[in-house]
Amino acid sequence: MVIFYAVFISLITFNAHADSHHPQEFLQSISGTKNEGEQVYAHFCVNCHATKPLIPVGAPRIGDEEDWKIRLKQGMDVLFKHTDEGLNAMPPRGGCFECTDKQLILAIKFMLPHATQEKPTK
């Protein structure tokens, strides 16, 4: 009987979450905005990549030069590949299966140390 209640509560919780989780709508609404990378980061990446992450799994922290030093030497192609395929505790596409490649790249660039970020062109 306890198992029945556990399954029942899990299904209710999952259903309630599924009804409120619409990543495609969110991603469409931010597409092309000035801070698209920041918004993708805040919605999908922040739990593991914040300066004080909720889920401390050893992911590089936003803006932390030491965390990103070795990764930056590998180049953006490798950073994107690791994001796309997943690496260590990070799931493929950072868990954002609905994100476009461009959105993932913008989120990566947003997380890089400020000094390494590309300067905007006029």
Give short role names for the model-derived ranges:
Residues 12, 39-42, 84, 93:
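Processing junctions and N-termini across compartments
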Residues 41-44, 52, 75, 86:
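Short pre-active-site segment immediately N-terminal to redox-active cysteine/selenocysteine motifs
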